[in-house]
A protein has these predicted regions:
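A short beta-strand motif characteristic of beta-propeller blades
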Residues: 19-23, 73-78, 117, 173-178
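Beta-propeller blade signature
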Residues: 3-17, 52-58, 107, 164-169, ...
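A conserved hydrophobic secondary-structure block that centers on an alpha-helix together
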Residues: 1-48
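Surface-exposed loop and turn segments in beta-propeller and other repeat-based domains
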Residues: 58-83, 119-141, 181-182, 222-236
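Serine-hydrolase catalytic core recognition
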Residues: 188-278
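Short, conserved, GDST-rich strand-edge loop motifs in beta-rich repeat architectures
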Residues: 1-7, 55, 72-89, 93-95, ...
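Short, solvent-exposed loop/turn segments at conserved positions within beta-propeller repeat blades
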Residues: 2-7, 45-46, 99-100, 155-160, ...
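Blade-terminus and WD-like Trp-Asp/Gly-His loop motifs, strongest in beta-propeller folds
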Residues: 31-39, 44, 88-96, 140-147, ...
Length: 278
């Protein structure tokens, strides 16, 4: 196990008289402040948990120990602590801290009093779909208590990308907006209109689209036009059983004019994971 990471000691320093209070000594975590400054929070890779420090009480709370789903990369294969799955953010007035597990999103009480709640209702785990919050307003530091947030998704089985929406103040399945055999960027929203620009990519090319709802989209660019002059390629997901009995999967690339009656040279490439890039 790699133990060479730098440890940090964090203090809260008064802007009035310069006095300081110890938050945590010799922690492997990275410290950040909540939007209102009521809490300092961090993730500790050795315990695989999130902690908060109250600027009012000075008390440290483990706010994720009641979450029984992994909050970190379960496929980590290097001799170091796995990376955290990340956070969605904070709700208004620092009321709740939204934490990601591998698939779903949890509402945690930064004071450590209320039990964490899976606001995506376990939908992600049940459907092998990862969710990540799309921050449409870069100036906004918190999520409204009853806000309907946009989530970017990837299905780990089909490899489809897409978008869902989710009301923050309810425990319910996210609502599907769009999904398909593409990879999507995080959309950019117009300041004063319900209009979005998003990049959609596949083996056929990558283009920019405009949409009012991210479901019905109009193509803006023709960046991949030059490909028509070339014999391009296709890709498909293949699965097989390895020598140890475990199932594995990968990508099979073929020329666009592939003829199954012909023989072709084959190149095998393997390094970590590539199939999610279908």
């Amino acid at each position: 196990q790699w133990e060479g990471r730098t440890k940090t000691t964090a203090y809260a320093i008064s802007t009035v008289d310069g006095s300081r209070r110890l938050i945590k000594a010799n922690s492997p975590g990275n410290f950040s402040a909540s939007p209102k400054g009521r809490f300092v929070f961090w993730y500790e890779p050795d315990t695989k948990n999130y902690f908060t420090w109250s600027s009012i009480s000075g008390v440290i709370k483990n706010v994720s120990d009641k979450i029984k789903e992994p909050l970190y990369d379960v496929e980590n294969d290097v001799p170091d602590y796995p990376r955290p799955a990340g956070i969605t953010g904070w709700t208004e007035n620092d009321q709740y801290f939204l934490i990601n597990d591998v698939y779903d999103i949890w509402q945690a009480d930064p004071n450590g009093v209320e039990q964490p709640k899976n606001i995506t209702n376990g939908f992600g785990k049940k459907n092998k779909t990862e969710f990540n919050y799309v921050r449409l307003d870069r100036e906004k530091r918190f999520i409204g208590a009853d806000e309907n947030i946009l989530l970017r998704s990837q299905n780990k089985t089909s490899k489809f990308g897409g978008f869902y929406t989710k009301k923050v103040n309810s425990i319910a399945d996210p609502v599907l907006v769009a999904e398909g055999p593409y990879s999507y960027s995080s959309p950019v929203k117009a300041d004063k209109a319900e209009q979005y620009i998003v990049q959609r990519s596949s083996i056929a090319g990558s283009e920019l689209f405009v949409s009012a709802n991210l479901k019905d989209i109009d193509q803006l660019t023709d960046i991949s036009a030059q490909q028509k002059d070339f014999n391009w390629l296709t890709v498909e997901l293949v699965k097989w059983k390895m020598l140890d009995g475990k199932m594995s999967e990968g990508l099979l690339f073929k020329p666009e004019n592939f003829d199954p009656k012909k023989k072709y040279p084959v190149i095998f490439y393997f390094y970590e994971k590539n199939s999610d890039g279908l």
